[in-house]
Amino acid sequence: MRAPPRFDRRALLLGGVAASLWAWRGGAGAATPAPARRLTAAAASQALAPPPAAPTRLLAYEGTVPGPLIRLRRGEALALSLANRLDAPTTLSFPGLRIANALAGIAGLTQAPIEPGGEAEIRFTPPDAGFNLYLPDAGAATARQLAAGLFGPIVVEEPSPPAVDLEAIVVLADWRLDEAGRLRDDSAPAGALVTAGAAAAPQRFAAPPGARVRLRLANASATRAMTIAVDGVTPLIVAVDGQPSAPFAPLRNLFPMGPGARFELVFDMADAAVAFSLRDDAASAPDQPLVVFACDGAAKPARPEFAGLPANPLLPKEIDLARARRFELTLSSGDGAALAINGETLSEWSGKPQFAVRRGAPVTLALINATAAAQTMRLGGHVARLLHALDDGWEPYWRDVFIVPPSRTVRLAFVADNPGKWPIASATPASRAAGLSGWFQVG
């Protein structure tokens, strides 16, 4: 694969890790397990900290953290049941899938939560191919449930997946543990423990020179934004937040992942190992390898340059900015630990919508961060283009998770084509509970 062109990634900007992994080898497409038909959310134990620490009491789907991989092809119906065996209400949400509002799984906004001991049947057909996460969105219980391990990956395959030799699916998360290996109940932005499932990081693969690799990477952390550094190859980013993008190389081989972000990368093995590592510039610490692809085996013939994933035909090719409805949301600090949107500290989905538009209307939205910390915001039910500073163009990818640096403004544009009540809120449950809990109406 030739060295890919570099773009000005101004919109990617800034943005204890556990990595759990699924992998397939193959030609035109990965092996396709049957979609999970039942998920039970319940207490579980998993060894996170090294001995002599005891296994950590977690919350899990089907007893595993992350939960089971759900995999299906675009156009295939997903039918599953969720059993709540927790001590608090929960839901099952699929952010990024652009499904109908009534199926979004957002307690208090789109549905009632599933009470302890209850069950729910979930049926939908994802409209888009892509890589996303499933997780709870259960109001005040969300922060604890997500931080304790309730998350898992869902892959909706393209009708004709690109030919690769190895596909790896990695879900990252960080953990806040005390000295005995028990979960701490705090909202620190980063956990102290760095693990890879039940084993020490990094997760390791082996592939021969010339092998084409597709890596699907997600950040399931409840609070932590991560900077990922790549060594040994210049990969192509081919999808962001569940939607295909024009292929591009990450600037300086770094890319930021806010909580909930998903990236897909394609690269061809050379004659040395490839490492994806966690970079912590604030701590001046060495990069922490998370995923390593060792070079091993007989070389494979060179492949043609990767042309990218098929564009999503359901997304607009253009957004008419001239007739767009324009809105601004200012994120600010309130009293104590409170946060506010446009001067109002919002409880879960309270009050009036931040804005309301007709179905099909183009929208531009300015997210103005007047706080002293970066804020990660999520757009519900839709994906948006990141606009250039003068609204004179946009980046060649779609996003639903946006890192807004302190004292900066991020502008986005989208077509409001999914009816219902949707969040425009923090992707960090603790910040959402502190007041960054807005919503908008599409009718």
Descriptions of predicted regions:
Residues 1-19:
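N-terminal secretory signal peptides and thylakoid transit peptides that target proteins
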Residues 24, 29-42, 144-177, 245-374, ...:
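Extended terminal and domain-junction accessory segments
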Residues 53-71, 194-204, 337-359:
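N-terminal edge beta-strand
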Residues 65, 70, 96-128, 200-201, ...:
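Extracytoplasmic beta-sandwich strand-turn segments characteristic of Greek-key/jelly-roll folds
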Residues 75-76, 118, 126-132, 210-211, ...:
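Short tyrosine-centred short linear motifs in exposed loops/low-complexity segments
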Residues 82-86, 218-219, 367-371:
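Asparagine-centered strand-capping/turn motif at beta-strand->loop junctions
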Residues 126-156:
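Hydrophobic or amphipathic alpha-helical targeting/insertion segments
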Residues 166-209, 218-221, 342:
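Acidic-aromatic/histidine active-site loop/patch
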